[in-house]
Amino acid sequence: EFFMRQELIRINSTDGIELPGILYMPDNNTNKIVIHIHGLSGNFYENRFVDTLAKTYTDKGYALITFNNRGKDYITEMLKGDHAIVVGSCYELFEECILDIECIVNWVKDKGFNDITLQGHSYGCNKAIYYYDKKKEDCIKNIVLLAPCDIPKEIEIYTGDEYQNCIESATNLVKNNKEDEL
């Protein structure tokens, strides 16, 4: 069992999607925090290893925040204002991860955290690196990659001999503004 200070949170992404999550705090005040970014179709509450990480980090004097991003589950709904919108890894546009991570970074900075570690798990690793590359914020001191993945290689392995046909088909759909048919 893990006993530590926890707070359920709801933070709106830069474009207004409500992102629920949890903040774990150490016993003593700190300016250090780890922002955990879940992987493809993940969420903040089912990756049990995050409980262990939260205990380890808080014991070392770090806070940890983990949250649902718009890539949560395969297909799901999240709130945007007063209505639900369909999101999930099936609809996620990778570049929009900036909108989710940015609001979390801004929220923790507003709470007094100025020593930030971005931590990604699986597909979340790609998002952490992408965010840092695009924003290059001085408050981000570290990046932790947990089980990083190579999406193109995984697709190639999964599709086998059909890989090139899949790439060409996807490229044509995008060129013809038919991304939803992917």
Where are the regions that the model predicts?
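Alpha/beta-hydrolase active-site loop
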Residues: 85-111
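Short beta-strand immediately N-terminal to the catalytic nucleophile in serine-hydrolase-like folds
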Residues: 118-120, 146
